[in-house]
């Protein structure tokens, strides 16, 4: 394993750790404040915009989709993680740095959420953004990593001026 590939997997591990620690802190703080129901841990209001930290649980995929298919969804997620590991392991040297960063973020986010499912039976979400009466579905750092990685990957694939060898 090269130094670069080791740093990629170490970065992924650190991001997963950051995600899990943030969820643990939110859950512990929530239990201290209100042991029987989710507690508002933090709020920031700026005009009609608000940012809240309130623990919630998601048994499905993004936005709670497919919650009734827990086992197939878990199998699919594990399959995607294994594919990402294999792809990064096999193609690592030939990947563009932006592709590597994007896939590392996606891998870390996927691992963070699968870890939640294995340990809690559901994903722990706690970040909430609201504007007027509109609320974006709650999310966590793992979701943010997946979203950022996807945006980086799509941006790189779409806007790359280099030869069209993406992977």
Curated annotation (Swiss-Prot):
One of its GO terms (cellular component) is plasma membrane. Pathway: Protein modification; lipoprotein biosynthesis (signal peptide cleavage). It comes from the Bacteria. Disulfide bonds: none annotated. It is found in: Cell inner membrane. Its EC number is 3.4.23.36. The chain crosses the membrane at residues 8-28, 46-66, 70-90, 101-121, 139-159. It is a multi-pass membrane protein. The keyword Plastid does not apply. GO terms for molecular function: aspartic-type endopeptidase activity. Keywords: Aspartyl protease, Cell inner membrane, Cell membrane, Hydrolase, Membrane, Protease, Transmembrane, Transmembrane helix. Its main location: membrane. The active site is at 125, 143. The keyword Cell membrane applies. GO terms for biological process: proteolysis. It catalyses: Release of signal peptides from bacterial membrane prolipoproteins. Hydrolyzes -Xaa-Yaa-Zaa-|-(S,diacylglyceryl)Cys-, in which Xaa is hydrophobic (preferably Leu), and Yaa (Ala or Ser) and Zaa (Gly or Ala) have small, neutral side chains. This protein specifically catalyzes the removal of signal peptides from prolipoproteins. Belongs to the peptidase A8 family. PANTHER family: LIPOPROTEIN SIGNAL PEPTIDASE. This is Lipoprotein signal peptidase. The gene is lspA.
């Amino acid at each position: 394993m090269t130094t670069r590939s080791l740093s990629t997997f170490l970065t992924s591990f650190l991001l997963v750790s950051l995600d899990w620690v943030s969820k643990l802190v939110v859950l512990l703080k929530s239990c201290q404040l209100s042991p029987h129901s989710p507690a508002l841990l933090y709020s920031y209001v700026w005009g009609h915009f608000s940012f809240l930290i309130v623990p919630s649980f998601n048994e499905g995929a993004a936005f709670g989709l497919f919650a009734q298919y827990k086992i197939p969804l878990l199998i699919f997620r594990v399959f995607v993680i294994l594919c990402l590991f294999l792809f990064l392991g096999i193609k690592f040297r030939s990947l563009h740095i932006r592709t590597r960063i994007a896939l590392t973020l996606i891998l870390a986010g996927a691992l963070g959420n699968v870890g939640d499912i294995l340990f809690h039976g559901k994903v722990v979400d706690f970040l909430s953004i609201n504007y007027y009466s509109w609320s974006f579905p709650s999310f966590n750092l793992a979701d943010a990593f997946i979203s950022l990685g996807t945006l980086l990957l799509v941006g790189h694939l779409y806007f790359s001026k280099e030869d069209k060898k993406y992977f």
